Amino acid sequence: MTASSLRIASRRSQLAMVQTEWVRDELANAHPGLEISIEAMATQGDKILDVALAKIGDKGLFTKELEAQMLVNRADIAVHSLKDLPTNLPEGLMLGCITEREDPADALVMHAKNKDLTLATLPEGAVVGTSSLRRLAQLRYHYPHLTFKDVRGNVITRLEKLDSGQFDCLILAAAGLGRLGLGDRIHELIDPSISLHAVGQGALGIECRDGDAAVLEQIKVLEHRPTSLRCLAERAFLRTLEGGCQVPIGVNTRFEGDELVLTGMVASLDGKQLIRDELRAPQDQAEDLGNRLAELLRSQGAGEILAKIFAEARPEA
């Protein structure tokens, strides 16, 4: 990189490219004359589509290949959906900035035959498609009469599977649908009382080399402080629980006056156990808030739930 150039690593999926091109355009507007290039590539999570995400492994499924490009100086930044970025990054890399969050809610997308129904009124045995253990566990807890099936592929592929009749509905991130111009497919936004969203959902995280002052100066225009505070608390919560992106851990954050309020949840995969609580703290104590809520849930049994999940997921020797 020179002071007048910036190389961006991105996944090559349609949604990833939309997000990366938005970052490129915002940086180009902020820095006239900056030469920006995008290197798109497939990650492990993109390549393995016939296995549930949780069975592949967890650390960096959608990020490792992008990070490798930065570590060998073939890219200067990587653009991630923040929910896919592990809380512990490889040595030499850092989370440079977090963009303003879109709606972090989970969204219900219905098959046309169910257009007059809601998630709450779907009949027994209706087939719900989701690749997220977090969504699966929470929905099993609230709607044990429904049937859940794994669905993989990019957003367009998943919608095609829904429309072909393989599912009665899908649960997807509202932000991703919106960024793809598919907001009209959202049948309802799932209330946080039913489904807490993933850590970082709806925000983009821009990763860079640790201490790269020139790059940090270039990307700081995209930093959104309120989103950063919320996500700092969420990521601390996840890190302290020693959870990853593919475990049933959910969060919700909101501001009330000068305080940040964090709600957190851990559930068993069968949906029979769900531990949920909430804490608040001054905004400048966001990370400590996440740590404290994680310890509170641990004291209520969350550690045992997660230990069982990790033990069952561990491959046989």
From Swiss-Prot:
Residues bearing the modification S-(dipyrrolylmethanemethyl)cysteine: C245
Pathway membership, UniProt: Porphyrin-containing compound metabolism; protoporphyrin-IX biosynthesis; coproporphyrinogen-III from 5-aminolevulinate: step 2/4; Porphyrin-containing compound metabolism; chlorophyll biosynthesis
Family: Belongs to the HMBS family.
Cited CDD domains: PBP2_HuPBGD_like
Functional note: Tetrapolymerization of the monopyrrole PBG into the hydroxymethylbilane pre-uroporphyrinogen in several discrete steps.
Hydrolase listed as a keyword: no
Listed InterPro entries: HemC, Porphobilin_deaminase_cofac_BS, Porphobilin_deaminase_N, Porphobilinogen_deaminase_C, Porphobilinogen_deaminase_C_sf
GO biological process terms held by the UniProt record: chlorophyll biosynthetic process; protoporphyrinogen IX biosynthetic process
EC number(s) on file: 2.5.1.61
Reactions accelerated catalytically: 4 porphobilinogen + H2O = hydroxymethylbilane + 4 NH4(+)
Disulphides: none
UniProt KW keywords: Chlorophyll biosynthesis, Porphyrin biosynthesis, Transferase
Keyword Secreted attached: no
Top EC group: transferase
Cofactor dependence: dipyrromethane
Protein name: Porphobilinogen deaminase
GO cellular component: cytoplasm
Highest taxon in the source lineage: Bacteria
